[in-house]
Amino acid sequence: MSENLIIFNAKVVTPLGFSARKGKEMAELRILEKATVEVVDGIITYVGPNRGEVRDGYYHHFWHYNARGKCLLPGFVDSHTHFVFGGERAEEFSWRLKGESYMSIMQRGGGIASTVQATRELSFIHLRSKAEGLLKKMTAMGITTVEGKSGYGLNRETELLQLKVMRSLNKDEGVRVDIVPTFLGAHALPDEYRERPDDYIDFLIRELLPVIQRDSLAEFCDVFCEEGVFSIEQSRRLLTAAGDYGLLPKLHADEIVPLGGAELAAELGAVSADHLLHASDAGIEAMARKGVVATLLPLTAFALKEPYARGRDMIDAGCAVALATDLNPGSCFSGSIPLTFALACIHMQLTVEEAITALTLNGAAALNRADSIGSIEVGKKGDFVVLDSDNYHILPYYVGMNCVNTTIKGGMLYPSV
């Protein structure tokens, strides 16, 4: 559903462009005081100075919104999440606090394996209800587009079920966020294929990719390219096959060790490589050359007490950097956009302006959507965030506190209270 809307007396704060902003470009924002934004049928048709027609009644067939000088930003794009899952893993959080590593928990049957079991046990209705509840919490923080991954089924039935849940939610007009589905069947090895990773990759290629293409269930294929999970060669083979079925490549890359995932992402022309805590200088440079978006997930590093990805170095090397929450039931049960802003600026040394670009236009680019969302420009969707202030610097300054007053999706207003 979309509406006709006129927003006036706004302080527009937005990156510009229809592709990712790289390097120094990330700090460049357009700022318009006392601005009007016009939305017709959910699409932006005017951005500029306040217009007298608002006072003269020209817009009588529009909803009117007086921003009263507050900042109007593009809707936030959360380009990496795992929001469709069963169960929780709160006890594992306590284990990590006592010093146990994420990988050691996985090796003794916890981690992803425990979520896989819980997800396989849920019906479509229960899985959908849980996912919808999480989305409502996320949209209150200004998220208007969210990526969601499968990867907690690791079998034919439940991987497809996760993707069908996302499709169902995407068609529901009551769900006020656009969902971009990603197939992450190569998230871990299921017990059925323990010690047989090559056979499992064959299974994904043979049994799942054709169905996903036939039923249009996903746009991207992702893989957990990591030591002890899927190798460079296994990841290359799956993503190459996925491309033959029309899925664009993404990678969980260099999260735990410097395996060379960033280099593989550049080799394959991936849309994005994500995590990148241990990406090499050569990998960063290769991603910058090939235009691979570096999607950084500071909440996960925070929750795991790991070193943060080198966001400042990546931007200085000419990369396009995006930020996302990585909401998931294990390593990061958080969809907090406010805390993402704060951690990125404090620990990754992004400026506020760069962080805004990373969570809007570059997040859109990480989902192959920079032509339609991510900035406030004519021709793009009417997706916005109204802050509680005329000062956008509050985004990281209000550490972990939601400063979104209103979310606007397709020209429809949703107060955050």
Swiss-Prot record:
Binding residues for Zn(2+), per the UniProt record?
Answer: 80, 82, 252, 326
Tell me which Pfam families the record gives.
Answer: Amidohydro_1 (PF01979)
Q: Which residues form a coiled coil?
A: none
What Gene3D superfamilies does the record point to? Metal-dependent hydrolases, Urease, subunit C, domain 1
Q: Which UniProt keywords apply?
A: Cytoplasm, Histidine metabolism, Hydrolase, Iron, Metal-binding, Zinc
| InterPro entries linked | Amidohydro-rel, HutI, Metal-dep_hydrolase_composite, Metal_Hydrolase
Query: Pathway it acts in?
Result: Amino-acid degradation; L-histidine degradation into L-glutamate; N-formimidoyl-L-glutamate from L-histidine: step 3/3
- Can you say where in the cell this protein is located? Cytoplasm
Which catalytic reaction applies to this protein? 4-imidazolone-5-propanoate + H2O = N-formimidoyl-L-glutamate
Cofactor binding note: Binds 1 zinc or iron ion per subunit.
**Gene Ontology molecular function:** imidazolonepropionase activity; iron ion binding; zinc ion binding
What Gene Ontology terms describe where this protein resides (cellular component)? cytoplasm
**Per UniProt, where does N-formimidoyl-L-glutamate bind?**
152, 328, 330
Q: Which residues bind Fe(3+)?
A: 80, 82, 252, 326
Q: Which family does it belong to?
A: Belongs to the metallo-dependent hydrolases superfamily. HutI family.
**PANTHER family in the record, alphabetically?**
IMIDAZOLONEPROPIONASE, IMIDAZOLONEPROPIONASE-RELATED
HAMAP family tied to this protein: HutI (MF_00372)
This protein's name:
Imidazolonepropionase
Q: Which organism is it from?
A: Bacteroides fragilis (strain YCH46)
